[in-house]
Design a protein with these regions (language model features):
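Acidic, metal-coordinating catalytic segment for phosphate/diphosphate chemistry
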Residues: 1-22, 29-34
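Short, well-ordered strand-loop elements centered on a beta-strand within folded domains, enriched
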Residues: 21-29, 111-118
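Conserved active-site beta-strand-loop modules that form the wall/rim of enzyme catalytic pockets
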Residues: 22-25, 81, 101-102
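Conserved Nudix-box catalytic region and its N-terminal flanking loop in Nudix hydrolases
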Residues: 23-72
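Nudix hydrolase/Nudix homology domain
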Residues: 41-54, 86-157
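Helix-driven interaction modules
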Residues: 71-78, 103, 109
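A short coil-to-beta-strand element that immediately follows conserved catalytic motifs
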Residues: 77-86
Length: 157
């Protein structure tokens, strides 16, 4: 299924935001096949925490997958319930052709730390700081992050 564009897999994609400080959690994906399951996204800058829906998520698959992915990929004291804000269908690259995104936000006032080996580093940035990252040609930005950013920015400002 992972490479069959006729059957897109649904992927929760959760932005972690601090609405009071108007900041977003930004991270760089790990490099090296030993650290990362999805090699097509290695070393890219991303704001979406997410992944495939698993059988264990079956009772409420989308919400359960969002929470499970947050707990796997980041560390924080309390995991907020994400709110779905939209959908993403991006056929511009090999990853997007086989996935359909459910974009959500998780609001927190807590500190967030990287959780697993798939994330090289991560921290909160304000809108202006993140837009500098987006516009810096040295950074390879994940397409879903770039496509959903205008909606997140509007939400924060």
């Amino acid at each position: 299924l992972e490479n069959n564009s006729a059957l897109q897999q649904i992927i929760p994609y959760v932005w972690i935001i601090n609405p009071r400080e108007k900041k977003v959690f930004v991270y760089k994906r790990a490099s090296g096949k030993q650290n990362y399951n999805e090699t097509r996204l290695m070393n890219k800058v991303s704001c979406g925490i997410g992944g495939h829906i698993d059988r264990e998520d079956s009772a409420n698959p989308i919400e359960n997958a969002m929470i499970r992915e947050l707990m796997e990929e980041i560390k924080m004291e309390n995991y907020p319930k994400p709110k779905i804000i939209g959908y993403l269908n991006d056929d511009s690259d090999s990853v997007g052709k086989v996935h359909f995104g459910i974009v959500a936000i998780a609001e927190t006032f807590e500190d967030v730390k990287k959780g697993d080996k798939e994330m090289a580093e991560g921290k909160f940035y304000n809108v202006e700081e993140f837009e500098k990252i987006l516009n810096d040609s040295k950074n390879e930005i994940e397409s879903w992050t770039r496509l959903s950013w205008p909606f997140i920015r509007d939400y924060l400002t």
